[in-house]
Amino acid sequence: MGDSIHGRDLMSDRTTRRQVVQAGAGLALTATLAGCGLGEGPSGGDTTQRITPKVDGDLVYFNWAQYLNPSLFKEFENRHGVTVRESNFDSMPAMMAKLQSGNHYDLIFPSAEFTHKLVGADRLLEIPRDKLEHADVVYSYFDDPWYDPDSAHTVPYSLYVTGLGYRADKIDSMTGSWRDLTNPDAEGRSYILDDYQEGIGMANLVNGFDLNAVDPDQLEVSKEYLIGLKPDLRGFTSDTITSMASGNAWIQHLWNGDVVNIRYRVDNPDDIQFQKCREGLPVGSDCFAIPVDAQHPGTALLFIDFMLEKAAQNVKWTGYPMPTKNS
């Protein structure tokens, strides 16, 4: 296990959600998106082809691990006589790389920023909202999101914020600040998310900068702040659930929904608490989207409609709110 700020704490479970999303994210994200080389990818089909929610084959599903109630897979399979073939990614750039290399998926879950890039590159099919029986449960706020005008290619899946999870059975007090990552009670058992956007964003907030600061001088200050945390940290990890549930982490930089899953895994759920930090909170969202080269877009659309119907059941399991009236 890597104990330095430059290393990663590797856990046995697959990586769970996630990737921070911030409207107008900074230069580092822009560089990552450019590196995806979407303009040079394999040619797709007609992004405006009219699709309908009907079975046209098994569902090839590509998402973060443990980011959807698994019982809903079985219910969908039994209802429609299909198989859900699940694959997982551990970062948004990894998802983009798979798409770019010619892998075919019927349903993906990009963050808002990456959705914006995919839409701009004509890599997503249009989703006919009028064909979704349960489309009216989605809040109208998402009728015209900045990342997908007129919500033509996506349906919102989740909302989340980033903060600090902590073990109340180990930590005597928290101050309500991101600076609690160096709380002496943690005894070197603090972790930062293995996500450069989250790390830099947190450091920007601590230093009084905009979450999405792009000024080179400010970013240098934030970089030095992160390096200065090294003596007080155990390392980076994306497997926040295993890290905290096992007791390996006493303070963990994480997404709010993971707290629910961690509480399922410990003897006393009240030991696991979530702190919103006063300097500010990154807020993000992920979407349902159908790649332009999907082999079974009808089944994918059918699954999206099914998930809108089952939103409450999904939220109870994942801990991540869905922007729907029935959840």
Where are these regions (language model features)?
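Bacterial signal peptide processing site
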Residues: 37-39
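Early extracytoplasmic/lumenal segment of secretory-pathway proteins
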Residues: 46, 50-117
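N-terminal secretory signal peptides
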Residues: 1-15, 26-33
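Short helix-loop capping/hinge motifs at secondary-structure junctions, enriched
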Residues: 170-176, 208-214, 294-300
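A structural signal for short loop-to-beta-strand junctions that line the ligand-binding cleft
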Residues: 104-110, 125-163, 189
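Mature extracytoplasmic/periplasmic domains
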Residues: 286, 291-327
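Short beta-strand->loop
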Residues: 125-135, 154, 269-282, 291-294
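Ligand-binding pocket segment of bilobal, Venus flytrap-like solute-binding proteins
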Residues: 191-195, 199, 203, 210-275
